[in-house]
Amino acid sequence: MLWQAARLRSEVNAMLTRKMDGDSMLFYEGNTLVLAVVETDLDGGILMALQGELRSELAHHIQDELDAFTTVGVKVTVDFKNVTFVSASALNALLISQQLIDSLRQGQIVLRNIPDATYRKMDEIGLTELLMIED
């Protein structure tokens, strides 16, 4: 049973392709762009603008990017303005990155432009108390 779950996860990940384009990470399913992650400088930190669907199978990519910056003390502002879907796994990835920051006592993650439905879900499960959210 466990091997079937691992095989299914592998097949799902195999359908997505990651491409780098300058300061952008682009994730495709076939020829369809699923998620774009565009990173730019922002007041001594990084702005990570997301566009598209933050699916479960992409959560670890976002977490890896956040951790790479925050473990060296960089502030990362994550902009959800153009996000159309956020999975529970993606929310968990944000929480795990925040816990790493808390343990290292360096770096910072700030979330902004969170869609109303996502904010309500985050509030229901207590994430709005644990994560820094900019109005």
Regions found by a protein language model. Give the residues of each.
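Generic N-terminal initiation segments characterized by hydrophobic and/or small/turn-forming residues
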Residues: 5, 13, 30-32, 47, ...
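A broad, low-specificity signal for short, low-complexity segments enriched in glycine/proline
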Residues: 8-14, 36-41, 54, 69-73, ...
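STAS-typified acidic loop motif
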Residues: 25-63, 82
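Intrinsically disordered or low-complexity boundary/linker segments at protein termini
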Residues: 134-135
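Non-catalytic signal-transmission and effector/linker regions of two-component phosphorelay proteins
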Residues: 2-38
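Feature targets compositionally biased, intrinsically disordered low-complexity regions
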Residues: 21, 29, 43-44, 72, ...
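Amphipathic alpha-helical interaction surfaces in cytosolic regulatory modules
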Residues: 56-131
